[in-house]
Amino acid sequence: MNVVIIGLGAIGRMIVDGVAGDESPVRLAGVAVRPARAEEARAELVSDIAVFTSPEEIVAARPDMVVECAGQAALRQYGEALLSSGLDLMVVATGALADGDYRARLLAAAEKGGARLHVPAGATAGLDGLGALK
């Protein structure tokens, strides 16, 4: 399973470290960061991990799953575009879903794209959420 994560903070790094190695069924295909952090991210990651700075770049890569682990602002920036393009999205910033209007927009985008919106149990799914995808 090819996965792209949004965010390279504490949770994102935990996922990067957790999927490293041959034993993992998950392949980290890329990481999305703010444009100002792109070069820094490229220097930190192994060369076969792409660095993205926009939803359009992720859509073009066609991963099997995108995992948002950068907070509500990132979810609002990426969520609807990814789902409406047919990409499954796991949301770690579940607090954003408390906004009923926004939640409805995400669900409509998922329906439009034939995608799934995954909301893992607990405040932070991290590696446990990815492990459930096996």
Where are these regions (language model features)?
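Hydrophobic Val/Ile/Leu positions in short beta-strands of Rossmann-like dinucleotide-binding domains
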Residues: 3-5, 68
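N-terminal Rossmann-fold NAD(P) dinucleotide-binding loop
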Residues: 12-13
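NAD(P)-binding Rossmann-fold cofactor-contacting core
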Residues: 22-44
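General beta-strand structural signal in soluble alpha/beta enzymes
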Residues: 68, 91, 117-121
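Rossmann-fold NAD(P)-binding glycine/threonine-rich loop
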Residues: 77-80, 94-116
